[in-house]
Amino acid sequence: MHKIVFVTGNKGKFAEIRDILKTFGIEVIQEKNGYPELQEDELEPIAAHGAQYVANKLNMPVMVDDSGIFINALNGFPGPYSRFVEDKLGNLKVLKMMEGEEDRTAYFKTVIGYCEPGKEPLVFPGVVEGKIAYEERGTGGFGYDPIFEYQGLTFGELGDTEKNKVSHRRRAVDEFLEWFTSKA
């Protein structure tokens, strides 16, 4: 069985990645200690840097996830700063910022960074299009899930099993798995 260290302190992200990868015979080990995060406007260099930094530090294959919600009416805000905005403002303030906005389109993007010790990092993006709901709906998921609507339901309403089939993270992991299984 392959072992990959997944770097996150987020229990929801870890559970989602673990549940997806275990069906492919990959054991995922959580590493809660983070890494010096680059301040960039794009997710790809952040994920690549993090994966390479931790892979070389732990001397093990490492996967990191950098994700963001990009709201078109807000010029892509909060984007790569989504975690900070969620911590400081929360969903209700994001909804307040969206008051009066007709364009509620948004997308979630995850970039999986993967690196083996001493090698160059690889990145695998995944995107899911949707829109910002008018209010929080659902109790499932985490982060922006209760305000991100996909095909009529928020990620918070979908439940973990259904969300894990269609999420941005799932799409990024699928890209990773396509590469990973082709090299095995």
UniProtKB/Swiss-Prot annotation:
EC number of this enzyme: 3.6.1.66
Swiss-Prot/TrEMBL cofactor(s): Mg(2+)
Keywords per UniProt: Hydrolase, Magnesium, Metal-binding, Nucleotide metabolism, Nucleotide-binding
A GO cellular component annotation in the UniProt record: cytoplasm
UniProt entry tagged with the keyword rRNA processing: no
SUPFAM superfamilies: ITPase-like (SSF52972)
Gene3D superfamilies associated with the record: 3.90.950.10
Molecular-function GO term, any one: ITP diphosphatase activity
Cofactor note: Binds 1 Mg(2+) ion per subunit.
Binding annotation for substrate: T8, G9, N10, K11, G12, K13, S67, F142, G143, Y144, D145, K163, H168, R169
Single biological process term from Gene Ontology: nucleotide metabolic process
Pfam family, one: Ham1p_like
Record field: catalytic activity: XTP + H2O = XMP + diphosphate + H(+); dITP + H2O = dIMP + diphosphate + H(+); ITP + H2O = IMP + diphosphate + H(+)
Tagged with keyword Cell wall biogenesis/degradation: no
Residues reported to bind Mg(2+): E37, D66
Active-site residues, Swiss-Prot/TrEMBL: D66
Family: Belongs to the HAM1 NTPase family.
Its job: Pyrophosphatase that catalyzes the hydrolysis of nucleoside triphosphates to their monophosphate derivatives, with a high preference for the non-canonical purine nucleotides XTP (xanthosine triphosphate), dITP (deoxyinosine triphosphate) and ITP. Seems to function as a house-cleaning enzyme that removes non-canonical purine nucleotides from the nucleotide pool, thus preventing their incorporation into DNA/RNA and avoiding chromosomal lesions.
Complex and partners: Homodimer.
PANTHER family reported for this sequence: INOSINE TRIPHOSPHATE PYROPHOSPHATASE, INOSINE TRIPHOSPHATE PYROPHOSPHATASE/HAM1 PROTEIN
Protein name: dITP/XTP pyrophosphatase
Organism: Methanosarcina acetivorans (strain ATCC 35395 / DSM 2834 / JCM 12185 / C2A)
